[in-house]
Amino acid sequence: MGGGSSSNIDNNTGIWSGTVTEANNGGFVGVRSTPFQGALDMSECKGIEIRFRQGSGKRFKFVVRDSTDFNGICWTTSFDAKNNGTECIPFSGQIPTVFAKTVSGSSFKVNGVVGLQFAYSKFEYDGELNRNFDTGKFVLQIVELKAY
């Protein structure tokens, strides 16, 4: 988490909630899977579909990782979560990033997916601010994740 921000996810309900503060260089929270025990080959899939509730119109990031280096490149897509909705995240549209900074020269290894992550951050990409970010409490219920 960033600075004094904190969050938790309830594995039974999929409710991810917490409090975001900009104190102590904060302004973001995240939740991620543990690295998968063997990479997923998603080469027959076009992307990931997320079904959610309670997003309150906030702008979140969905991250797919093809490396266990959690300080390395990740594949990121931003989405606005209405109260109830579905978002399709095509692999072809994901942005390679390292800590919200875009990078070039990398290719997503669709046959080597090792983790998934959600983030809520005051930053979009390359220092640009998230237009739907507020400090304070947030809630996102992740109802379903599936490949399509």
Language model features: what each stretch is:
Residues 1-148:
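Beta-rich carbohydrate-recognition modules and glycan-binding surfaces
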